[in-house]
Amino acid sequence: MSQEISTENFAGQVVTDVAAAISGVLTNIGHKKGLYKAMAGVGDITAKRLAAITQCDERYVKEWLNNQAAGGYVHYNQISDTYYMPDTHIPVLADEESPFFLIPALEVAASLWLDEDKLLDIFQSGKGLEWGEHHHRLSCGSESLFRPGYKTFLINDWIKSVEGLSEKLESGAKVADVGCGHGVTTILLANEYPDTHVIGFDVHNESIATAQSRSKESGTNGNLEFKVASAKNYSETGFDLICFMDCLHDMGDPVGAAKHAKEALNPDGVVLLVEPAAGDDVSDNINPVGRLYYGVSTVVCTPCSKSQEVGAALGAQAGERRLSDVMKEAGFSSIERVAETPFNIILAARL
């Protein structure tokens, strides 16, 4: 149970939230104008020097730096009137390949403000809202947010955490990436395992078109396909691995999707389920990560599920117990947690 605080202290908490919300715009500016990258690893820097490097207006840069210092993103030296970014902040603010790079989350937030009228409507009506009905910045921001984590963990951690899976993929196998979106994980798998045939499925036509374009740019060797299909109606079978990457909780009928995966899987195959990190009870998730995920779940994940058949609305904080129950109801006999990160839990399900 939360401890009550004074009205004054609670007002201060809300001021902190409002300041963070407004500062998110400045963080996005810092990313898009190269301000963070220009500060990374250079030590103390003046507003004038930073403005010259980035070809931005000095007065705006000075005010931006003061905001960043007030938020603790950079440090300020009053004596020299200089600013610097600690090395420990670089992976979060300036390194786009780091799994801790979080700036794209602000692109997601920006998209949701643009969807405000739609969200007000569904809160009243109880209707759903498909991913494709959101502003396009949602898909782009989500891809940029998830990509570094997938590149860091998918091949070297999650796949290798499932006994025998890496060896099977290296020798040649068949893989489905269900709900593949723009194809980040699909392309990673195809490039890493050239003797394995990988198929990405997604119900969203525009996402599949983007994935196909990315596939051509990636230089895969012909072992990769993308197809428009839902999680319950792709016709291919004989898969050694079926992946659900941060998407099962978005589906209207997760049990139906898991049942279809069971039917499409080889007897010794495995389903790899990547889901947002969450405890099994609400009280386990009363923390900043839980707050973030409950927020996204309220305005993205739950509406997405409610827009589909069944509308189970698992939400982005379903937790391992509920996810395991889904897989068991679908007919899987073995479900185990094989890996985790600060933001994800990874389950492997077998027949």
Language-model features: where?
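Conserved adenosyl
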Residues: W113-H249, P254-G256
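Short amphipathic alpha-helical interaction segments
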Residues: C56-N67
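C-terminal alpha-helical "lid/dimerization" subdomain adjacent to the S-adenosyl-L-methionine
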Residues: V274-E329, E336
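Short glycine-centered segments of the SAM/dcSAM-binding site in methyltransferase folds
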Residues: K174, G269-V270
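A short glycine-rich, Lys/Arg-flanked "PGG" loop and its adjoining helix->strand segment in the class I
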Residues: V255-P267
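Conserved Class I S-adenosyl-L-methionine-dependent methyltransferase catalytic core
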Residues: Q13-A21, T27-G30, K37-A38, N67-A173
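Short acidic, hydrophobic short linear motifs in intrinsically disordered regions
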Residues: D44-A52
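Core SAM-dependent methyltransferase catalytic element
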Residues: A330-L351
